[in-house]
């Protein structure tokens, strides 16, 4: 159902326990951040409950607590989610708090300064953690200067530059009723849920037209690179191998989902089997790709001793090749379908899980009903289709490798695999551009 101001509402009764969840999905994810102000979308979401036109942060917290309600907010790449869970009897009262937050978050300076310090302190820790840093570098290398390549959590420099006015401007620009979607589920009748959405958000209007999201947030596919971030003090190395993948609405999505489950889904994936079970090179090795409105990245990752980083990178490349060349058999795919379908079904059982799945689908341009088709879609994928998706997309020759660790312990062996290695010091690393600030 669509409200008069353009808000799309999806309501489903997913249980009998009288607790419900309302998720409000607005545009303006991290892909709308400029590099100079990376982190604006995340700050705008996280700090939205720190004061509105009518309530202080303390009043908001006390009100939600008195109603038995919990509120979370997060900015993904493609949009921002607010999720409110409360007893049905208190749902309207809690929803009034949420409505005030979405419409009129004020971002008090003191709260911004406190969150900024906490976030910058956290980033300093992450920049010394090989696993955290490798993930940031891989994202930047895979997307270059395209919107998806922006650091969603910001950099120390960008967080220092964010002002209160930036956050208010972000809210006023991107949180727009005509582009907003509301999902309500749990122990609440759909008619009651839709009525609540109408009473809470139906009169929300904004004078300015709806903003236009970035047209091509993933940008062009980037050159294949082998990047080593040298961290001499690292006790171990983090290894990533990443390839360009597909948007959520691509017809090959379910084939790639199944192929990836064979490769690196959980402890029965091939990467775990080869790297952990057979060779004890790591405590775990996995692969995955996010659901995105534009091209995602499929990445394999593991942490290992510095001296075996090159060996893990080679296993990643070998397993990428094997996935696309060695035929997949139906029995193997059946086991993977069971694994994927089971975890998906468990997520759908809770109102928060249901809402997050449906909100994601809507954000990625698919209809909410797709949530109920997941197991069927996986069941329709043939071994040949899964193999073809792997061959086309999970190609070792197209894989960018990122290793963060003590380079001296693996660099010579890595050059035997990939001669064209870029070695960049971790100290003072600039994550605002794909050349790490080294050019120009």
Please give the residue ranges for each predicted region.
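Conserved, carboxylate-rich catalytic/transport cores that coordinate ions
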Residues: 171
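M16 family metallopeptidases and their MPP-like homologs
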Residues: 10-12, 16-49, 55-104, 116-124, ...
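Peptidyl-prolyl cis-trans isomerase
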Residues: 106-107, 111-112, 162-164
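An aromatic/glycine/proline-enriched structural segment found at the starts
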Residues: 144, 148, 152, 176, ...
């Amino acid at each position: 159902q669509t409200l008069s101001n353009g808000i799309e509402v999806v309501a489903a009764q997913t249980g009998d326990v009288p607790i419900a969840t309302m998720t409000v999905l607005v545009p303006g994810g991290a892909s709308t951040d400029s590099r100079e102000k990376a982190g604006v979308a995340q700050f705008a979401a996280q700090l939205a409950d720190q004061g509105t036109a009518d309530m202080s942060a303390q009043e908001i917290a006390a009100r939600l607590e008195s109603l038995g309600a919990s509120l979370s907010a997060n900015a993904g790449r493609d949009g921002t989610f607010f999720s409110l869970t409360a007893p049905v009897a208190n749902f309207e009262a809690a929803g009034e708090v949420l409505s005030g937050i979405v419409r009129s978050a004020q971002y008090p300076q003191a709260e911004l300064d406190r969150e900024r310090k906490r976030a910058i302190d956290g980033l300093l820790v992450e920049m010394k953690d090989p696993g955290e840093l490798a993930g940031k570098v891989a994202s930047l290398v895979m997307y270059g200067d395209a919107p998806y390549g922006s650091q969603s959590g910001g950099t120390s420099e960008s967080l220092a530059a964010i002002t209160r006015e930036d956050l208010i401007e972000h809210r006023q620009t991107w949180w727009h009723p005509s582009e907003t979607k509301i999902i309500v589920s749990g122990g609440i009748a759909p008619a009651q849920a839709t009525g609540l959405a109408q009473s809470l958000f139906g009169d929300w209007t904004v004078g300015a037209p709806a903003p236009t999201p970035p047209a091509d947030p993933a940008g062009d596919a980037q050159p294949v690179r082998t990047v080593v971030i040298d961290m001499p003090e690292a006790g171990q190395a983090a290894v990533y191998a990443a390839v360009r993948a597909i948007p959520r609405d691509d017809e090959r999505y379910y084939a790639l989902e199944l192929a990836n489950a064979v490769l690196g889904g959980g402890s029965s994936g091939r990467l775990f089997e080869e790297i952990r079970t057979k060779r004890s090179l790591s405590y775990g090795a996995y692969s995955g790709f996010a659901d995105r409105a534009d091209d995602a990245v499929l990445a394999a990752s593991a942490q290992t001793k510095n001296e075996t980083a090159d060996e893990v990178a080679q296993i990643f490349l070998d397993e990428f090749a094997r996935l696309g060349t060695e035929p997949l058999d139906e029995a193997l795919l059946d086991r993977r379908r069971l694994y994927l379908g089971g975890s998906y079904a468990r997520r759908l059982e809770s109102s928060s899980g249901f809402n997050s799945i449906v909100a994601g689908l809507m954000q990625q341009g698919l209809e909410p009903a797709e949530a109920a088709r997941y197991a069927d879609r996986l069941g329709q994928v043939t071994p040949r289709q899964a193999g073809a998706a792997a061959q086309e997309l999970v190609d070792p020759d197209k894989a960018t490798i990122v290793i963060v660790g003590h380079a001296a312990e693996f660099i010579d062996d890595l050059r035997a695999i990939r001669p064209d290695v870029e070695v960049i010091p971790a100290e003072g690393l600039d994550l605002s551009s794909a050349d790490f600030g080294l050019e120009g």
